Amino acid sequence: MADPQAGSAAGDWEIDVESLELEEDVCGAPRSTPPGPSPPPADGDCEDDEDDDGVDEDAEEEGDGEEAGASPGMPGQPEQRGGPQPRPPLAPQASPAGTGPRERCTPAGGGAEPRKLSRTPKCARCRNHGVVSCLKGHKRFCRWRDCQCANCLLVVERQRVMAAQVALRRQQATEDKKGLSGKQNNFERKAVYQRQVRAPSLLAKSILEGYRPIPAETYVGGTFPLPPPVSDRMRKRRAFADKELENIMLEREYKEREMLETSQAAALFLPNRMVPGPDYNSYKSAYSPSPVEPPSKDFCNFLPTCLDLTMQYSGSGNMELISSNVSVATTYRQYPLSSRFLVWPKCGPISDTLLYQQCLLNATTSVQALKPGASWDLKGARVQDGLSAEQDMMPSKLEGSLVLPHTPEIQTTRSDLQGHQAVPERSAFSPPRRNFSPIVDTDSLAAQGHVLTKISKENTRHPLPLRHNPFHSLFQQTLTDKSGPELKTPFVKEAFEETPKKHRECLVKDNQKYTFTIDRCAKDLFVAKQVGTKLSVNEPLSFSVESILKRPSSAITRVSQ
């Protein structure tokens, strides 16, 4: 019975649709479709009706009885071709079918009745599943009321959005009538409604694309905990949704703050201001605007944070320059120097040069401010053979006591230190075995001696300003130290001993100028230091800044006096 009815229904509806098209002038064709897979009806009219239905549910429920009697045709049973009147045997089924779970609005034989039924809203959930159901009185009995398919979820989100918009328009209309529409209240309420509308739209988009929304990631990948922004401008910028712009602004903000910290921290090189090398590399790669090339292999695992804060703004050349030149002046074991320390800053910003000079001055004065009697800090760091020769050189303040072997205990006199030079055991300050190819071709000893003599004469005749004077004296010493490990002749000892003697007078003059800085550095560097620790025979010297700065030497005392 169902098949012939379906076939006759299809033909019957075609005839009704054509006749109704002639009758309607503007409204359009009736939207009643067969119960099979149906094309989606016009959403414009239905959406408005659905909105009114979503807001006014009373109007939706008020006509349950009307629908059963209003439609002469039976819902759920299409009429046959010949008879405009419904079949008498099936007439008693009209009232229960009107309240059943499945309702189908079909045009009746009359001209006005089908037009009225075609304009009634249809259930969007039923339409998603190929069924056309009149929405009036259908909400409670919809078969797909709790369906969780993608189409039905999209319908729910659309209904929420439309309901929020309708509520906003109604509230604005009532406020305009009462004359209470203040701008502040409007903005607050509008923000609330927009916030309600925005989240469902994201959910609807995710439903359309076939996936659920992912929880929002933490800032910068979630792997890097960052301090909050430091300015009101950045806090306001965080309100925008542009993540790339936020990253750029945050990077600029952190650079400005780090430059301020650098200018404050560069006053003293404290031993505890150290950062592990891997942390520095990851930090630099995370915040640098351009891809950063990894540091050269002659850099060790530790870098002072005072230098790190500026290395990320300059190129690799400036980074090597600042680190190597400061290490020449202060003998930081963390900077194995390459032969490129003669290079001066490239065409970078002026802040690099100023920072370098300030770091050089402060680091040099901090080494000169060492008190007698301070102890070596022992650590289990091993001496690496691959370090370059300049790393193992001490500045001219040590007065030639550059070769320090492992003995049962450290002797504080200069003669004892020089007497143990013949011990074959290697120490932290002994020349390393050069098992790597030199970066730059080594010059002859005569050429280097000539350069040393020339620099020493210029340094004696024309005393440089306060910033440049320490570097030139140490620059001179380092050139002599370069030739020592390579030649390995008795002349090495003579070169080490002669150079400090030549520049002792210059250093004494410098120390008189640095008196005010020495007092300040001495207070900060030796607050919690102990005295009297001795070295064991088998424990190597540490390559940390603490061990260098806590060096007890009568030579340093003699020079500083």
UniProtKB/Swiss-Prot annotation:
GO cellular component term of the entry, any: nucleus
Compositionally skewed regions (Pro residues) per UniProt: 32-42
GO MF: DNA-binding transcription activator activity, RNA polymerase II-specific; DNA-binding transcription factor activity, RNA polymerase II-specific; identical protein binding; metal ion binding; RNA polymerase II cis-regulatory region sequence-specific DNA binding
Any single GO BP term: myotome development
Organs and tissues of expression: Expressed in testis, kidney and skeletal muscle.
Highest taxon listed in the record's lineage: Eukaryota
Annotated stretches, region: Disordered: 1-119, 414-435
Location relative to the cell: Nucleus
Keywords: DNA-binding, Metal-binding, Nucleus, Transcription, Transcription regulation, Zinc
SUPFAM superfamilies in the cross-refs: Cysteine-rich DNA binding domain, (DM domain) (SSF82927)
Bias type Acidic residues, positions: 13-26, 44-67
Main location: nucleus
Residue ranges of DNA binding: 123-170
Low complexity biased stretches: 68-84
Family: Belongs to the DMRT family.
PANTHER family noted in UniProt: DOUBLESEX AND MAB-3 RELATED TRANSCRIPTION FACTOR DMRT, DOUBLESEX- AND MAB-3-RELATED TRANSCRIPTION FACTOR 2
Assembly with partners or alone: Homodimer.
Function: Transcriptional activator that directly regulates early activation of the myogenic determination gene MYF5 by binding in a sequence-specific manner to the early epaxial enhancer element of it. Involved in somitogenesis during embryogenesis and somite development and differentiation into sclerotome and dermomyotome. Required for the initiation and/or maintenance of proper organization of the sclerotome, dermomyotome and myotome.
Protein name per the record: Doublesex- and mab-3-related transcription factor 2
Lineage: Eukaryota, Metazoa, Chordata, Craniata, Vertebrata
Gene: DMRT2
